Design a protein with these regions (language model features):
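N-terminal secretory signal peptides that target proteins for export/translocation
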Residues: 1-5
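Terminal, regulation- and interaction-focused segments at domain boundaries
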Residues: 80-96, 147, 151
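Hydrophobic alpha-helical segments of integral membrane proteins
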Residues: 16-27
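Extracellular/periplasmic low-complexity linear segments
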Residues: 26-72, 77-81, 87, 102-137, ...
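N-terminal export leaders
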Residues: 6-11, 15
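A short, solvent-exposed beta-edge/loop patch
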Residues: 138-161, 168
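Primarily extracytoplasmic ectodomains and periplasmic/lumenal surface modules that are beta-strand-rich
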Residues: 85-86, 94-99, 107-110, 156-160
Length: 192
């Protein structure tokens, strides 16, 4: 009799667990409640992009970055790693995106020079050294027929390594958009 009681008890628990799991899935899948687009915390909101906000970033800065992420498929990029830095050529087939790209790049290079970290929530930790040692970077920026050309050099080997790393990160974002950010953050054990 006790073996039969145990078997019924185990089957009952199994059925309860199954229904509990199915119920949890259904509830968290409903629009507005779970892992869906606009859910309550278990999602990535790629419409409003709250991860683009920063403690020291204006709404305009965040909106400009959103333009780049929302239109990443119009952006192409070439990177040459130099022994003392990088040379990049970045372009967009969309004139409005190209304007945002140029403005963002020039503004960020200026902010690095001033040590003015925007502290964007999804910002790569690679940028930390730039804001700490911005005076160790020499930047030359031009807009040419081939695109936005950025040459950045440094005598500081740590800064050069960070320039190489960040150039690769930006290229990944130009290739994959926000997916690249999610992959980088997951690899670093970070969330936003």
């Amino acid at each position: 009799m006790s073996q039969m009681f145990s078997r019924k008890w185990v089957i009952g628990l199994g059925v309860a667990a199954l229904f509990g799991g199915v119920g949890t899935y259904v509830v968290t899948s409903w629009h507005g409640y779970g892992a869906g687009h606009h859910g309550m915390g278990l999602h990535h909101d790629e419409v409003n992009m709250p991860g683009l906000r920063g403690a020291n970033a204006s709404a305009e800065t965040s909106a400009e970055i959103a333009v780049l992420f929302n239109n990443f498929d119009t952006i192409t990029r070439e990177v040459e790693n130099l022994s003392n830095g990088i040379r990049t050529v970045t372009r967009s087939s969309d004139p409005a995106v190209m304007d945002a790209l140029v403005n963002h790049s020039v503004t960020m290079i200026d902010r690095v020079g001033q040590g003015d970290d925007p502290k964007i929530r999804i910002q790569s930790p690679t940028l930390d050294i730039f804001f700490l040692r911005g005076d160790a970077i020499t930047s030359h920026v031009t807009v040419e027929d081939i695109g936005l050309v950025v040459l950045q050099t440094s005598d500081d080997p740590d800064v050069v390594a960070a320039l190489h790393t960040h150039a690769a990160e930006v290229t990944a974002m130009a290739d994959k958009g926000m997916q690249a950010v999610h992959e980088m953050m997951a690899a670093q054990g970070r969330t936003h």
